[in-house]
Amino acid sequence: MKNQIKYLVLIILLLNVSGQANATLKLKEIRTASSDVLVVVFTSEIVLPTTNYTTWINTKIDVNEVKTGDVSGWKLNGIQPLEINKFVTESSATNSGPKRAEHRIFLKVPLLINGTVYKLETPHGDTTFVFTNRTMFCESIKTNQTAYSGLSDARFANFAIWLGTGGSQQIKGKLPEYNVYDITSGRIVSKGALEDIGKDFSSGDYVYRIDLSGVPEGGPYKISVFGYGCSRPFGVGGDFSTRLGYVSFRSMYYQRCGIPLKKPYAWEDIRENHCHTLLYDVNAPTGEANLVVVGTEPSFTVYGGYHDAGDADRRLYHLIRVPPVLMTTYEAFPEYFTDNQFNIPDKFDENFNILGKGNGIPDIIDEAEWATLIWEYLQDPDGSVHWGTETKGYPEPFAIPMDHDYKKYGTIRIDNEATGMAAGVFMHLARLLKPYKPERSVELQQRAEKAMAYVGNNVNNQQKLYFAVQKYLLTGDIVAHQQVKDLTSLFANSEINNPGSSNYSNNILAIFFYPYLIEKERPTDQVVVQKMKDILRNTADREITIFNSFAYPVGNPITTKRQWGNNVNQGQHAYPCLLEWGLTKEQKYIDVVSQLMDYNQGLNPIGKCYVTGLGFDQVKNPHDRESEYTKSRGWGVKPGILVYGPGNLPDRIEFTILPEIRTLPRERQWVDHLFTYGMNEFTIHETLIYPAVIYPVLAEGRIWDGTKDPFDVVEHSIISEIKVDEQDKIEIYPNPVKNNITIASTENDEILNLKLLDSMGKVVFQVDKINLATINLNMNSYPNGIYILRIESRSGATFKKMIKIE
């Protein structure tokens, strides 16, 4: 999906700078970090004569490529900065392309003045810009760049100054005021002053809070902090949330295995044919990328399931976490999920060729059925189920559609855990499909019974509970109901003595019993119901306590053992709160859900949207083979991929970052580098599934048409930000003007310099060293509209507003 953002941002740069020390170094943007810190952003790349991986990975970015050693080479309006700091981070894809990096140079300068034109001199060229509170991006303002939830009564942005090698900084003196304004009209919708939150250990930031709870649903908005600059655009609820829910849910579709990815369901014709449908019955032991297929083993055709991540494995973890979350979410919020909601194919022939969509079944159930389908193929006649599928190594070639992968895939061994989990999933899906596909429901119920009969007492208690709940709700079986009662009592006692002990493979226990809580047709035991309610509420309340212990909504305890993706797994932490809100409608629970889900949309120390295709500071290099293919075609990356994010350091550091990454706090330990698997890979079960179901609930089930970008607006003029001098030391006439305008000093004062700015503050014409009392300016080549003249005479600078007409 191509994010066509047309809002106009004031970045007035001379991109073709002269005198570059390195031909690959480009001046990209001017920002602020504070009222007296300017951020000059450069990008660089190294084009290698070879695509050899070893050569490529060992080629290092020069952190001193931007020349900061001599302060005299930098000037702002002729004044040298008092101090220079830097942050350098690599941003590379694969060894078939260049090594890339971003250099952010922090210049300590005099206090910036609203409406002032500045000339910046650097060792790599000069540029001119205008600083205004509403148009200069301040990177210290951290917001959800996509959609704050309209369901929440609490929302916020954070403000934190971080200067790379200069570290975290506090604001000196009185805390600044801010306002929130609609960027299309300029209307202020909320205002206040920054609130001191204090030092945050997890991020290393000294944090200030910007209250957004009074901002109404709508947008796009920006936050303007007086003297500092403005935030990136953001929206609240409405189309903003709807688009976020749509993109997030469809991330599951883009990871499907055994299906083409083509228009009109994909944004381009990515994968023309089915992939990975030929499976060899190897029955190999579990192991990472270590399954050898000879090619003489018995083979069969399969469909369904998902590619695990940047590879094409289909693993037990998908079965444990994906179908139960999809189906439980639907049962908790059936009003928010419908058919034709997410533009996914749901009509197929017997060989799973796509016939269309609109089968009358909610899309979320269709997705659960696709997630379950592969496990039906992996079930043997005796009821047992394989652990998954695997190959030797990873899909090859690298940047390809998955239907071009030439590797052979085989089955992994029969597994009791897979069989026990499949029993519950098959029974759950049988129950949900019964009103729509009764014959299919019967088949799934039979599969469930065979799986449970095979695994017997080798199933764990969570799987027993899941199966028993679903069997009782589907059939009314008395024995199954008694199992529900007995197991719930067992778990309730365990939770009293050891909170959280009943969780299973990152699934909270409530996923397995929640349908029993809300059952309306079968009789339920109210003692059991209360025990279930207590377990769920206690789980949700623990997450609220953790949420409140950090300045950013990271939700992940400091004590958590490092694992891939644990600092972007806000969905896992939010999910029990979501279920509790679904049950009780207590506002505090949906407030915490909403705020936790702001983190990976940009409300984090780096200000990065960790989800591809969303936000304004996006992930460019997810470790995803098909995304590298779509990038090579000029289509951008597959949207909706939530990468693993910060805090998961590899044993070997093979990328460039300054300050050194081990010295950074956990929430800043991230590099946008495709080969940092622990940071830029992802999985269907760890990072994608929870956003896929939570964001549509936060959007209240609204349907997005897939084309209307709510950020596709024209920004309000900056003219209101520039103080226009109405005194008559300088005259301009005629005004309005058709052809030529005269600028004259009424006091015979020499005009020294002249700048013509358009309505967005861009310098469209400039002339220096005039030294005349009168000058004529030809306006014939300029389009109609409002302009600002900045006229500098010996008496000082004057701003004049003028109108160009036909």
Predicted regions mapped to residue ranges:
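Aromatic (Trp/Tyr) and acidic
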Residues: 25-80, 91-105, 146-147, 153-227, ...
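Surface-exposed, short loops/turns at beta-strand junctions within beta-sandwich domains
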Residues: 108-115, 213-219, 780-784
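Edge beta-strands of extracellular beta-sandwich domains
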Residues: 125-133, 230-237, 798-803
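Low-complexity, Pro/Ser/Thr- and charge-rich linker/hinge segments at domain boundaries
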Residues: 132-154, 231-269
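Residue-level detector of functionally pivotal "anchor" positions at catalytic/ligand-binding pockets or at interdomain
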Residues: 134, 705-733, 747-748
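C-terminal outer-membrane/trafficking sorting elements
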Residues: 184, 723-806
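Acidic, glycine-anchored loop motifs typical of Ca2+
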Residues: 343-364, 736
